[in-house]
Amino acid sequence: MGSSSLSEDYRQCLERELRRGRAGVCGDPSLRAVLWQILVEDFDLHGALQDDALALLTDGLWGRADLAPALRGLARAFELLELAAVHLYLLPWRKEFTTIKTFSGGYVHVLKGVLSDDLLLKSFQKMGYVRRDSHRLMVTALPPACQLVQVALGCFALRLECEILGEVLAQLGTSVLPAEELLQARRASGDVASCVAWLQQRLAQDEEPPPLPPRGSPAAYRAPLDLYRDLQEDEGSEDASLYGEPSPGPDSPPAELAYRPPLWEQSAKLWGTGGRAWEPPAEELPQASSPPYGALEEGLEPEPSAFSFLSLRRELSRPGDLATPESSAAASPRRIRAEGVPASAYRSVSEPPGYQAHSCLSPGALPTLCCDTCRQLHAAHCAALPACRPGHSLRVLLGDAQRRLWLQRAQMDTLLYNSPGARP
């Protein structure tokens, strides 16, 4: 299979995932298996993909005493580069993706931590970025779509190469060896076993190889990487960013509908930041466990627990997300009543009905899109969507867990609005 055939398969994978509401790096298991096997047998495929594999791997591993964690860091950097190229290909109209801040958390911690500035700039130049000043890279002219697919595929291949090298180290029994010997053995071998045998013979000439460092617990799941948020905004958090704002979803035009953290990392504020949102004591909030890093497939999302108002508040909301009233006067009737405000104080306020399920949703069906302007939940192929897309605020609901929670919220809003005393 040539590089052009791989590029076409990779492109189809990205567009298939976009139709499912996900705009991210490739996770197709069959394409992954095919590319893995080709790379194992032929390291020179990297040359056909023009991904600068040897230069990037040498730069990222040079001088590292323990190669295993260095390879994991490189894989995460290549994933972030792949994501940047995928964003430009799938969502070229999103202006957020045309500017990368070199002082952002993703750039400083994930990219610059493992790769040199010159190689990073070269990688971004392939995507059409040029250095605007000492703090920003900007796209002045978007490259052809086929070039962006080729760059993203190259980064995907580099991620797999890091995993292949990690498998070699695991079978070798040590990850403490010179990087140049590992890369030399990898280029000279046609499979993992022969690469391991070559290294074993080489290490036996020197001394007994040191033992493999103890494996730690599986890395905690980290939010899908993006490149757009300032360093001061995400410093100390696991969510790395390269752009000015959190990454938006594929069908959400304005910047305020940017990508949101996973459900288990979201804030516990159902009614937004306007007014004094009630916060339960810390001990009342159960700590949700995180799935292993890399569990990006929809099927691996944690099943939501039994529905409750507390879980809905915790899972669904975060600052600026719910497009709810901005002032305390427009807060939830239940919350105002809980704070001791007389019912007459809010009955005089014309309160919106909250979110509602559009008529396109059949009973039991989960929504795919949420319009924050119409405050309605829609199916993916709703006939009313063309009227919303030009100027309304659309967000994509990713995964069954989030879709189910939004549907439950709409049902709750409807109940609150229709309940006695909810309206004047």
Swiss-Prot record:
Keyword Nuclease, does the record have it?
A: no
This protein's source sits in the domain of life called: Eukaryota
The record ties this protein, via Pfam families, to: SPATA2_PUB-like
Q: Does the keyword Glycoprotein apply?
A: no
Which Gene3D superfamilies does the UniProt entry name for this protein?
1.20.58.2190
In this chain, the stretch annotated as Disordered covers: 233-258, 273-300
Please give an example of a GO cellular component term from this record. Answer: cytoplasm
- Sites where Phosphoserine occurs are at S327
Xref: InterPro entries: SPATA2_PUB-like
Q: Which UniProt keywords apply?
A: Phosphoprotein
Which family does the record claim for this protein?
A: Belongs to the SPATA2 family.
* Protein name as it appears in the record: Spermatogenesis-associated protein 2-like protein
